[in-house]
Regions:
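Boundary at the C-terminal end of the N-terminal hydrophobic targeting segment
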Residues: 33, 37-39
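Short, solvent-exposed mixed-charge patches
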Residues: 282-283
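A short, amphipathic edge element
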Residues: 45, 76-77, 154-167, 219-224
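N-terminal secretory signal peptides that target proteins for export/translocation
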Residues: 1-16
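Short acidic/glycine-enriched loop/turn segments that link adjacent beta-strands
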Residues: 89, 173-176
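N-terminal mature ectodomain segment of secretory-pathway/periplasmic proteins
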Residues: 42-128, 165
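Gly/Pro-enriched, hydrophobic low-complexity segments
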Residues: 98, 109, 121-125, 133-135, ...
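Bacterial N-terminal signal peptides
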Residues: 18-33
Length: 283
C-alpha cells in the first residue's frame, strides 16, 4: 500500500496521501489464501491519515530516470517525463517514456479518485501496436513496464480497505520513525494490489514514508522499498530517489531505482492534457 503512495508521489508527481502518489507503490513471505484477521489501531490509522493529508505540492512536472537491474547485475535505463494535476480532491497524472527507442512514446494515464470505494482509472498506450489498453482491476497487480512496481502502486490506496497496527518507534537514518503494519481487510484487495501485507516506516518530523516492506500475495517474494534521497523542493518534502528490491528468500531477483530531477511545482497544466487522446499523441 505504501509503495503505491510513494511511487505515485514520485512517479506521477503527486501524492496527497501516503506513501501518488504517488509511488505510489508505492510494498514480505506470509502467503495467505484468506483474509488476515487484524485489529485496527486508531493511533496507527491516524498517523497514516496524516501521511495521506500532508502537503505534497500542486501541479507538478518532473523527469524520471528508471534503472532496472536483473539478478545478474545487467542494467537497463529508461527515461520518462511525468505530469500531474490536482482536480479537486482527485489527481490526474500522465507519464511519457522518452527512451530507449523500443518504449519511446509509450504513455500511462491515471485518474486517481479520492472517493472511497471508487475504482481508479488507468490507461496504457503502446505505440508499437497503436493501441491503448485500459488496465482492469484484476491486472493492477502486474508489473509496470518491467519494473518492481505494480500498476496498483501508481494510485492512492483507500485507507478503508486496510487495518493498521503501530508496531514500535525506532530510529532510521538519524530520524525517529513509526513502524506500522498494514493488512488488507479482504482477499479481494490482496488480489488486486498483489500484496498480502505491508510494513512501513514513517518519519515523525514530516510524515513521509521512507521505508517499506511488501509481502507479495501468494508468493515467497518480498519487495523492499527505501527512499534514498529526500529533499525539500519549493518547500515540499520530495522523494528524489527510491530503490525497490524484490527478493525471494535472501536472493535478489530484481531491482528498480527511480531517480527524479527537474522537479517543478505549481505549473500551469490544462486538464486537456490528461485525456486518452493526448496520451496517444506521445511526448
Amino acid at each position: 500500500m505504501i509503495v503505491k503512495c510513494i511511487l505515485r508521489k514520485i512517479v506521477t508527481a503527486t501524492c496527497r496521501r501516503a506513501v501518488g502518489p504517488a509511488l505510489l507503490s508505492m510494498l514480505v513471505s506470509l502467503v495467505v489464501a484468506v483474509p488476515i484477521a487484524s485489529a485496527d489501531d486508531p493511533k496507527a490509522r491516524e498517523i497514516m491519515e496524516r501521511v495521506n493529508d500532508r502537503d505534497d505540492g500542486d501541479n507538478r512536472i518532473s523527469d524520471l530516470r528508471m534503472v532496472l537491474i536483473d539478478k545478474k547485475g545487467n542494467e537497463r535505463i529508461r527515461e520518462t517525463r511525468s505530469y500531474a494535476k490536482d482536480r479537486g480532491d482527485d489527481t490526474l497524472s500522465l507519464i511519457f517514456f522518452l527512451s530507449p527507442a523500443d518504449v519511446e512514446n509509450t504513455g500511462f494515464l491515471t485518474y486517481d479518485y479520492d472517493e472511497s470505494g471508487k475504482d481508479d482509472d488507468q490507461w496504457l498506450y503502446l505505440p508499437a501496436l497503436r493501441k491503448t489498453k485500459r488496465i482492469a482491476s484484476d491486472d493492477k497487480s502486474g508489473s509496470f513496464m518491467g519494473t518492481d512496481f505494480n500498476f496498483s502502486d501508481l494510485t492512492e490506496p483507500d485507507l478503508e480497505d486496510y487495518d493498521f497496527e503501530l508496531l514500535k518507534e525506532e530510529e532510521v537514518g538519524g530520524h525517529m520513525t513509526w513502524r506500522i503494519e498494514i493488512v488488507p481487510r479482504s482477499e479481494e484487495v490482496m488480489d488486486e494490489t498483489g500484496y498480502s501485507k505491508t510494513v512501513v516506516w514513517v518519519r515523525q518530523d514530516n510524515h513521509v514514508v521512507i521505508r517499506a516492506v511488501n509481502w507479495v500475495y501468494k508468493s515467497r517474494r518480498r519487495k523492499f522499498m527505501q527512499v534514498t534521497k529526500l529533499e525539500r523542493v519549493d518547500g515540499v518534502w520530495t522523494s528524489l530517489e527510491i530503490k525497490m528490491v524484490t527478493k525471494e528468500g535472501r536472493a535478489v531477483v530484481h531491482t528498480t531505482i527511480l531517480q527524479f530531477s527537474n522537479v517543478r511545482y505549481n505549473q500551469d497544466l490544462s486538464e486537456d492534457m490528461f485525456t486518452v487522446r493526448r496520451l496517444e499523441k506521445g511526448a
